[in-house]
């Protein structure tokens, strides 16, 4: 919640803001109501006296928590993330709620590899696949979408699991028209939902669960094609159902050109993964790499 206008606070915000017009840390904390004008003055005094950074001084005085500092820094560096419970997204979205943890560091490393090996090579779409239910494909797709959006890439996450969709739950989007409705010609591009908490992220939910998902995904005469999305987004990630349960993941990967396979430690059989790779190759798609889910 923003602070009510106060001349002293306004003066401090001016003092705390750099000349290039970008609000600095102190101004952001004032604007967010985490600091009062009097508190900011105390911070400035301690900062000068002990040669501290503004955030360090504010924490030392007990005026803000470390979480408040991290939130302000995320705004200052255009790196959005959420406080626990904010936006009511699923707790599995660790990239949104725990952006500085070890899991998210690994996600960022994976993002870098995908940028180098796939997206900078002219590709825009990638299928996220798994062998078994519970291997973590939906988890990986959702969190990768968040970290790509944090990089500034215009990112679209498509829930192409038309059997047991999860992304509408993870992003708290409810049951709304989605991919299945678009493929059936009952919805258009307006079914794509922007996620306000992440400026560069949009989600297309699965929509109504159809009785014939494989046939719907395979239709050559579909009114909507991936090329239509590629005009508006830099990165398109497609979540798919387990390959052991259906051929849907291979069908989707054939359209996207490549797949990233999620393997669950002590759970996924290597023979099944090899069979999936063979099916991909037969469909003209590439296996870009594998990710071992240890959680």
Regions from the PLM with identified roles:
Residues 52-54:
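The conserved glycine-aromatic submotif of the RRM
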């Amino acid at each position: 919640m923003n602070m009510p206008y106060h001349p002293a606070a306004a003066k401090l915000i001016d003092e705390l803001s750099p000349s290039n017009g970008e609000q600095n840390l102190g101004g952001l904390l004032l604007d967010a109501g985490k600091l009062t004008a009097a508190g900011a003055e105390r911070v400035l005094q301690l900062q000068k006296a002990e040669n501290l950074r503004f955030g360090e001084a504010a924490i030392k005085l007990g005026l803000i928590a470390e979480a408040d500092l991290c939130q302000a820094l995320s705004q200052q560096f255009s790196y959005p993330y959420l406080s626990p419970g904010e936006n009511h997204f699923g707790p599995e979205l660790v990239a949104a709620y725990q952006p500085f943890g070890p899991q998210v560091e690994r996600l960022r490393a994976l993002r870098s590899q995908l940028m180098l090996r796939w997206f900078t090579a002219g590709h825009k779409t990638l299928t996220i696949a798994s062998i078994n239910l519970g291997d973590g494909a939906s988890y990986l797709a959702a969190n990768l979408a968040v970290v790509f959006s944090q990089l500034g890439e215009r990112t679209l996450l498509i829930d192409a699991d038309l059997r047991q969709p999860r992304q509408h739950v993870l992003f708290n989007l409810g049951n709304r028209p989605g991919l299945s409705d678009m493929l059936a010609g009952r919805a258009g591009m307006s079914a794509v939902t922007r996620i306000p908490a992440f400026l560069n992220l949009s989600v297309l939910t699965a929509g109504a669960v159809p009785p014939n998902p494989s046939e719907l995904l395979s239709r050559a005469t579909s009114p909507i094609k991936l090329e239509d999305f590629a005009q508006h987004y830099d990165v398109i990630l497609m979540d798919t159902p387990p390959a052991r349960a259906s051929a849907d993941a291979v069908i989707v990967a054939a359209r996207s050109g490549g797949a990233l396979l999620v393997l669950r430690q002590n759970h996924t059989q290597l023979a099944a993964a090899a069979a999936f790779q063979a099916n991909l190759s037969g469909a003209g798609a590439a296996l870009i790499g594998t990710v071992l889910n240890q959680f």
